[in-house]
Amino acid sequence: MGKSPKEVLAEFQANMSKLQSAIPEVTADFTKRLMPDALKDGVLSTKVKELVALGIAVCATCDYCIAIHVNKCFEAGATKEEIAEALGVAILMGGGPALTYSTFAMQAIEDFAPEA
């Protein structure tokens, strides 16, 4: 069995910190400007934008991205049911690979869901 979503997220955060130290001039634009600006509330809420980002992450077959955006979906107020529906759209658009990566997203939902 592979790494859990929490392990994947922790690994990403540790390695991103190293990358930011090594090439801050490259990473700063993405992490400090582009990402916050793209995901802030606008006509679409941050929650909707995170659900879209999750669907793209699933279609891109990116474990790191899936772990990050499932966690961010919950932080933005999404429910398990809303996240599952977003996965359904990802499967529609991404086919078999998206279906496969949606199983990792389902584990991430269990790992990152707020305590009831």
Model-predicted segments: where are they?
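Short, thiol/selenol-centered motifs that function as redox-active sites or metal-ligating centers
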Residues: 52, 56-68, 93
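Charge-rich, acidic-biased intrinsically disordered regions
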Residues: 77-88, 113-116
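C-terminal structural segments of small proteins and small subunits
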Residues: 84-108
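Alpha-helix C-capping/helix-to-loop hinge sites
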Residues: 37-41, 55, 90-93
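Amphipathic alpha-helical hairpins
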Residues: 41-51, 65-82
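Amphipathic alpha-helical segments within well-ordered protein domains
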Residues: 35-36, 53, 70-74, 87-88
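Acidic, glycine/proline-rich low-complexity segments that act as flexible tails and inter-domain linkers
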Residues: 1-48, 100-116
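Residues at alpha-helix boundaries and short interhelical turns
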Residues: 20, 42, 56-63, 77
